[in-house]
Amino acid sequence: MMVAWWSLFLYGLQVAAPALAATPADWRSQSIYFLLTDRFARTDGSTTATCNTADQKYCGGTWQGIIDKLDYIQGMGFTAIWITPVTAQLPQTTAYGDAYHGYWQQDIYSLNENYGTADDLKALSSALHERGMYLMVDVVANHMGYDGAGSSVDYSVFKPFSSQDYFHPFCFIQNYEDQTQVEDCWLGDNTVSLPDLDTTKDVVKNEWYDWVGSLVSNYSIDGLRIDTVKHVQKDFWPGYNKAAGVYCIGEVLDGDPAYTCPYQNVMDGVLNYPIYYPLLNAFKSTSGSMDDLYNMINTVKSDCPDSTLLGTFVENHDNPRFASYTNDIALAKNVAAFIILNDGIPIIYAGQEQHYAGGNDPANREATWLSGYPTDSELYKLIASRNAIRNYAISKDTGFVTYKNWPIYKDDTTIPMRKGTDGSQIVTILSNKGASGDSYTLSLSGAGYTAGQQLTEVIGCTTVTVGSDGNVPVPMAGGLPRVLYPTEKLAGSKICSSS
């Protein structure tokens, strides 16, 4: 029986269970699988249970369901999962559906019983740690959730913030260019309002700091993803990050690095929205431009305090899935290769590996179980092999994760990138020619390899030899990405081995 080489490699790459209080340095080498708890896996293991995204109702995903599908996640080489918020939500079915997503909390000291019990959440943490994997939990400090108009909120339903005194006065954000409005006014609308906590008040601040430390400790959490970071004043975040005692990565939904990067001065990392937009635009069609992506890689590298602690992604529950723009599988493979081999921490959204194509929320919140969890789909296999070479490079090169990705050059359809110290570098060649792209040989200069050196292309498991002039002859075909690594460094790795 033939077994995929990345399965053999990943099976052998078991690490010690992580200690608590995982540091930013610990997280640099992780690869994250992001999932909505309600939409990933059910306790009963069903792959047919109905989940109509348009209904916006609970579909039955649980923490126990996740535990039962960790083989599926780890089989792609992921070393961490990020789950949606765990706190108790507003109980009503609103005009916008249920709070299945977890961002309409009402009681921060109780868990969302739809997902399971406290013991179930602890069991998920333990199950991950037994595999040497990390648990990241989504948290919300900016707001609570209310079924009704912002002008008529019953504040007594919120725990522990049970009076209006804990909140900013009611006003909806009208102008996102006004940072005071962004921080002090409310998200939501008069159907579901999101009362905005006044985090400038010591009583609110101290409550959150105590709560987040307890949450991390009680459930052995290794990292936090923080929602709506730009809607809270910056001086709140250093104390929150410190109280958590683990790596914190914030959502700052803005593509301008001049706006987004400074938030890394107040917490460990942020989601890399500055890269998201040019990455999407470069690959969502065969006419996309590489110029903006090339320039933004360099801008983020120079302007953000530490680009190696950012989260790289192209899909999540807030933005349309990549396949909603194009069904070209070659373009999807290039985007996935970029995410995993760029600077920072790769983040793949559940369903991306099955080429899910949901558009705007709620269509992009499909149930993963309806795919049947196949492990032989093209993107599942590509993600597994890309994570495998990244994990291997990290194990062999202590400087890999801190070496900042260098785009070697760009043209209308191609961008090659280099990451890793001399002699151990990975060179990734990305193309947006698409599945109908022609076959040709790219003569690549500037990759840093030596004349006569043999390289393995670890997607197709072929080899090339560096020319006497130092150029690498890279066979390109079908618009597929290429990933090069020194052949001699692969000895004993099982990478590109079928035995």
From Swiss-Prot:
Per the record, the gene is: amyB
This enzyme catalyses:
Endohydrolysis of (1->4)-alpha-D-glucosidic linkages in polysaccharides containing three or more (1->4)-alpha-linked D-glucose units
- Could you say which residues bind Ca(2+) 1 here? N142, E183, D196, H231
Cleavable signal peptide: 1-21
Q: What is one GO biological process annotated to this record?
A: carbohydrate catabolic process
Spell out the residues of the site Transition state stabilizer. Answer: D318
Names of the cofactor(s): Ca(2+)
Key words, A-Z: Calcium, Carbohydrate metabolism, Disulfide bond, Glycoprotein, Glycosidase, Hydrolase, Metal-binding, Signal
Class of the enzyme per the UniProt entry, highest EC level: hydrolase
Name this protein carries in UniProt: Alpha-amylase B
